Amino acid sequence: MKYNYSPEVDILIIRVSRGKLDHGEQKGNVITHYSKKGKIVELEILDASKETAHM
């Protein structure tokens, strides 16, 4: 698992598995990116500093 935080845009990207991104679904401030086979590849958290404060 790898992660990258971009403070300029306040986005946290968590790479959970290998594979190419095929499509994504957004629910609130979280975008879940999937492979063609439907496996979760990456999570993208928008407004990350606000979202992670609730964890």
Set out the residue ranges of the language-model regions.
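Structured beta-strand/loop patches that form or line metal/cofactor-binding pockets in enzymes
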Residues: 2, 7, 13-31
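Acidic surface patches and DE-rich sequence motifs
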Residues: 35
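A short, polar/charged loop-to-alpha-helix boundary motif
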Residues: 50-55
